[in-house]
């Protein structure tokens, strides 16, 4: 049995404390494979030991891989956040949500630890005694801005070796000759004055001193002109023009006192992408993108909370390593309860207040105070789980109040929408980044052909998956198509499985058999000449077999929330079920003509992939055999160990996990699963929406939406008064009384 391995280490429910804490799963070799946190350890951990079919597929894989479980009790949820992140960083568990940066971003670096600070552009953030400003979206824009600013603030940009060589020879570098360096190496400028130039350059680059400094230069220019110092006025004019160009590259989108991080979010069943805009002093000072694979069946609120913990833990650790939260753990035997203590960043908060006071007093940007890693405000498209705890934790990191909220209107809402759009585009790029490469795609198809013993590469691959609720309700299937290893969404199909009695197939194997039978009886299986399959051939081929009906429902082009094309194999939304008697005046129901136009199934695939192991493969092979299809290869990809199964073979084929062929099969399988579960949830949602409101006369769909949006549920409506109903737009007194009476009669 697949679930037996969990019984080897399943703790007694009474032994698990009903307290907040963090837990670790380990595999047979003692490696940590997953770290999680919970408000109530007992409730959370017992969920992992429920029947496997109730768990998310990847959670199934995780618990079947695990061989031990341990947990740590903490005092508060805030401590669990810190400890969970510490363990994730320490152990790098394979099943944990890890937000990956899709590229390295450029930063403006200032070597604050040197007596003569240096300014340069870098993509690494590992040097000690160095402050980093950014990230910036485009390196060429950063270099261009720095080049312009060096004419106004001629600071050192050379490496340590070049600087020491100039000191020994007494000859500065070329930048000093063209006015882009003040040559501190040969004492043309004092160290304190050079440091002040660095502070001013950083202040302009970060948006703190851009406009104020330009205003000061403008006043100086006018004074010089009034005193007839025209050469000085001309130099100041040129500096102002250069600074204006740099400042305009970072448009002011808010008031200058606005410091905020604005996040956008996009996700599907398998992956999520996040995009962030960094707003400092009213200007967009940078942007960044992360992507993550969904490991557990967690919602967007939990994903957003995990993102904020990871992003700001990294930022705070990079900028304040000396005052990062200290965690001491007393680790005992596996399965025992443990305690932790955490210290907050009081010293860092005091230092932040002192820097802010000093900057307000002097009017200068403090070189030792880079862009705050934690802003005053965080704008998110989805309110994160444990928002209040996160705000408290971020307040400690920042040394000042931090607010997390969802923008609903105004400029911040518009910027959040832009971030959402960027996240959506990044999600699509991430999904196709490897498979879209021609070389990788060719290698992937060749790997699959070699592993399965095919004569040629499978140019067209179809994959099938079954999705249903416990008990077989809302049973559906999906068919996804990959041509040249690229998803062809216009060929996607989805099937509503009905069965002989209209109640669905008896199990997943029967559902898979029905789906494939239906697909290939609608496809070009009677020969390329396009002849029909009559009723006698159909009955003969299906005699004694599982011949329940499958209605193949397709997606109209531009008519679904996934943006996927598709068409209807029958032209009416459903195929004609086998065995349904039509009117005698209509065409015989059991005759299926070969169709070649785009509204029907296309040509046969080279390879059929099913989501599952040997039983699923045998069911698929049987369906193809009964349909007279003998030139299409079949294989299955089992989730647990990613084994490839083929018909009539007692042992699986093992493909290297890092091979392009394995990646292609996984991509096809996961896409089919996503497509199936999306349709299943859509069907389930439609069924759940049929509520008590359907029985009330005069309350149509539009009124139902208004009522549900206002009250949230039918249960809340039953607790409402007539006056409460009248507050809903369009509901008068008479209709409110009818609603009240109808809901209380039921």
Swiss-Prot record:
Main location: cytoplasm
Compartment annotation: Cytoplasm
Pfam families xrefs: GIY-YIG (PF01541), HHH_5 (PF14520), UVR (PF02151), UvrC_RNaseH (PF22920), UvrC_RNaseH_dom (PF08459)
Entry keyword set: Cytoplasm, DNA damage, DNA excision, DNA repair, Excision nuclease, SOS response
Leader sequence residues: none
Record keyword Cytoplasm present: yes
One biological process term in Gene Ontology: nucleotide-excision repair
Ranges where the record places region Disordered: 557-577
Keyword Cytoplasm: yes
Location of the GIY-YIG domain: 18-97
UniProt xrefs under InterPro entries: GIY-YIG_endonuc, GIY-YIG_endonuc_sf, GIY-YIG_UvrC_Cho, Hlx-hairpin-Hlx_DNA-bd_motif, RuvA_2-like, UVR_dom, UVR_dom_sf, UvrABC_protein_C
UniProt GO molecular function: DNA binding; excinuclease ABC activity
Quaternary structure (record): Interacts with UvrB in an incision complex.
Family statement: Belongs to the UvrC family.
NCBIfam families given in the database record: PRK00558.1-5
Protein name: UvrABC system protein C
Biological classification of the source: Bacteria, Bacillati, Actinomycetota, Actinomycetes, Bifidobacteriales
């Amino acid at each position: 049995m697949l679930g037996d391995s969990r019984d080897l280490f399943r703790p007694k429910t009474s032994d698990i404390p009903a307290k907040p804490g963090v837990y670790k799963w380990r595999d047979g070799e003692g490696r940590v494979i997953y770290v999680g946190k919970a408000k109530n350890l007992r409730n959370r951990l017992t969920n992992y030991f429920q029947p496997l079919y109730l768990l998310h597929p990847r959670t199934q894989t995780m618990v079947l891989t695990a061989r031990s479980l341990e947990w740590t009790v903490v005092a508060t949820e805030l401590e669990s956040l810190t400890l969970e992140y510490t363990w994730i960083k320490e152990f790098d568990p394979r099943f944990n949500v890890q937000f990956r940066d899709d590229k390295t971003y450029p930063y403006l670096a200032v070597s604050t630890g040197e007596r003569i600070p240096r300014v340069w552009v870098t993509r690494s953030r590992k040097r000690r005694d160095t402050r980093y400003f950014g990230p910036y979206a485009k390196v060429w824009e950063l270099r261009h801005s720095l080049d312009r600013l060096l004419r106004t603030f001629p600071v050192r940009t050379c490496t340590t070796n070049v600087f020491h060589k100039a000191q020994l020879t007494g000859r500065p570098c070329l930048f000093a000759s063209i006015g882009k360096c003040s040559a501190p190496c040969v004492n043309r400028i004092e160290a304190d004055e050079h440091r002040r130039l660095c502070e001013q350059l950083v202040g302009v680059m970060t948006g703190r001193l851009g406009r104020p400094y330009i205003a000061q230069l403008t006043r100086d220019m006018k004074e010089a002109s009034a005193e007839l110092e025209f050469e000085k006025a001309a130099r100041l004019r040129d500096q102002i023009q250069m600074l204006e160009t740099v400042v305009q590259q970072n448009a002011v989108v808010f008031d200058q006192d606005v410091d905020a991080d604005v996040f956008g979010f996009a996700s599907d069943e398998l992956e999520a992408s996040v995009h962030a805009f960094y707003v400092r002093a009213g200007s967009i000072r940078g942007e960044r993108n992360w992507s993550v694979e969904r490991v557990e069946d967690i919602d967007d609120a939990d994903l957003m909370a995990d993102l904020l913990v990871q992003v700001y833990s990294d930022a705070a650790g990079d900028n304040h390593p000396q005052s990062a939260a200290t965690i001491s753990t007393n680790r005992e035997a596996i399965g025992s309860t443990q305690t932790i203590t955490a210290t907050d960043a009081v010293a860092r908060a005091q230092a932040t207040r002192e820097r802010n006071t000093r900057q307000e007093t002097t009017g200068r940007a403090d070189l030792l105070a880079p862009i705050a890693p934690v802003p005053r405000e965080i704008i998110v498209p989805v309110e994160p789980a444990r928002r209040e705890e996160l705000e408290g934790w971020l307040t400690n990191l920042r040394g000042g109040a931090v607010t997390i909220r969802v923008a609903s209107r105004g400029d911040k809402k518009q910027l959040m929408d832009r971030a959402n759009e960027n996240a959506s585009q990044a999600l699509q790029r991430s999904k196709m980044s490897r498979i879209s490469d021609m070389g990788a795609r060719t290698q992937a198809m060749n790997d699959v052909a070699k592993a399965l013993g095919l004569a040629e590469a499978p140019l067209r691959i179809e994959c099938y998956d079954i999705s249903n609720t416990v008990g077989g309700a809302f049973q559906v299937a999906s068919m996804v198509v990959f041509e040249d290893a690229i998803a062809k969404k216009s060929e996607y199909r989805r099937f509503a499985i009905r069965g002989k009695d209209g109640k669905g197939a008896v199990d997943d194997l029967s559902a898979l058999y029905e789906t494939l039978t239906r697909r290939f009886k609608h496809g070009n299986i009677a020969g390329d000449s396009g002849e029909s399959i009559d009723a006698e051939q159909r009955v003969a081929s299906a005699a004694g077999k599982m011949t329940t009906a499958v209605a193949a429902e397709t997606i109209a082009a531009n008519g679904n929330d996934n943006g996927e094309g598709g068409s209807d194999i029958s032209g009416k939304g459903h195929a004609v079920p086998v065995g349904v008697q039509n009117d005698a005046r209509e065409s015989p129901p059991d005759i299926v003509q070969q169709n070649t136009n785009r509204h029907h199934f296309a040509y046969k695939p080279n390879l059929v992939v099913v989501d599952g192991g040997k039983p699923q493969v045998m069911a698929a092979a049987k369906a193809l055999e009964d349909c007279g299809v003998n030139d299409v290869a079949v294989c299955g990809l089992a989730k647990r160990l990613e084994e490839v199964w083929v018909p009539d073979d007692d042992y699986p084929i093992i493909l290297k996990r890092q091979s392009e062929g394995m990646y292609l099969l996984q991509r096809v399988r996961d896409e089919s699963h996503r497509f199936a579960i999306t349709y299943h949830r859509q069907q389930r949602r439609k069924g759940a929406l049929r509520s008590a409101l359907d029985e009330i006369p005069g309350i149509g769909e539009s009124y139902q939406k208004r009522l549900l949006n206002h009250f949230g549920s039918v249960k809340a409506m039953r607790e409402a008064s007539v006056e409460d109903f009248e507050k809903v737009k369009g509901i008068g007194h008479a209709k409110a009384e009818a609603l009240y009476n109808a809901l209380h009669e039921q």
